[in-house]
Amino acid sequence: MRFELRKRMEEGVPVLTWEGTEPDRASLRDLVNQWGYALEGDCQINLEAFGAQQFRGEVSEAAYFLVEALMQGAYRFGKKALGPGASQRLFELRDELAVLPQVTVYLIFSGEYGEKTDTDEGQGSAGSGREAGNEAKDSSEKNGRERAKEAVEHMVERARCLGRCRNYARMLGDLPANYLTADDLCLYARKLAAKKPALSLEIFREQELRRMGCGGILGVNQASGIEAALLHLRYQGAGRGPVTALVGKGVMFDSGGIHLKSMGGMEGMKYDMCGAADVLCLMEYAADTGCAGSLTAAVPLVENAVNEKSLRMGDVITMLSGRTVEVYNTDAEGRLILADALAFAAREADRLVDMATLTYSCQEALGDETTGYFCNEEELAEQVERACEAGGEPVWRLPLGERYRRQLLWSKTADLANYMPDKRAGASVAGCFLQEFVNGRPWVHFDMVGPAVLRKENGRLEKGATGRMFAAVARLLEV
């Protein structure tokens, strides 16, 4: 999929356009996703008209939004690339697994790009004041056009990078669980870090996790035949701003444990690692675009399996933070691994962002189109709202507070319980559980159970992992 800037419309090439009143950004994303989903041949878009109508004349911002949303709609999972040995070669196969159509999208941007205009032909006698004035004016206009062109080109390239990295995350989510175990994702991360000098990587496996005291990660994984892992990535930005930690839930498959899911409930549980995939690929995006801010990432990888070694109802585990947790529900495992990862990340970060397919309660409240989020600081919440509005990602802030927190304090044998007998307000109770482990840092938690996965085709995105919230978090990292 190519994007090419042109000054004039190309004859015979279909033009993508819209009708009706100016939509909000979320509706606009749906429209552009639909364009990308239907692409079968070359097309063109009048970038300046689009920017004037939708982005208050900010053509470079219009280009960014258009390109990444088109790539989101155009993605298809390349199932033909799967086969024997593919799980060991996912990094090498990723462009065959994350497929885009072989088409060219012409972005029509009619600025002269610094070429001569009629006024460049200098009038009047050499050295006259009028000629000098015209030359200064023309030079200013020329420089302005060149700067505008450079700005648009820069934003198109950033958007292409965002779209590519997001589609890699979707590809990881779409992989069958037997093609993407914790071992396989560790190997993928090693190859990624080897290709990206700006990224450093540490991988902690079970021996190190035991020494660290990561009881949440180890407890959830103890029935699995594959070792748990904690991926720790770092990116050093050129700026002096706060260090942001990204934390992504990586349950490679979730059976529910002893509290075994039904067949319907277990469907799609390979997607329970979409948060981990998003975080890993957001780190790649930051490295590729030279993000100004410094980042760290903590990505716990487990399988919530069931056998005689599984966590049991009533078991007490000791977390990385030193706090103890009674396991009341083995299918509330995501918060256990995130708690260890958040405590780990809080040691070196100034603010925390976690992404997780965490609770069905959030999906029941908000549906499949809107992501719920929790935040413990107003300034960060305002930044989240701006980033999501600009990216066209519908979100809704859900409450935290003592009325929900006290539902975690009933255990006689531990500091906290991971679940509550009263199942109401489950998303807020889960958010309060996570907040116990952020060590007072500014923190936002995205609960993406509904939007992260599309259960059936909708004419805008392919069924499967959607990459929702990726663009919004990418914008948040630039704040």
Regions found by a protein language model. Name each.
Residues 1-13, 140, 186-479:
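A generic structural signal for tightly packed, nonpolar segments enriched in small/aliphatic residues
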Residues 1-243, 247-250:
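Short amphipathic alpha-helical segment within the helicase RecA-like ATPase core
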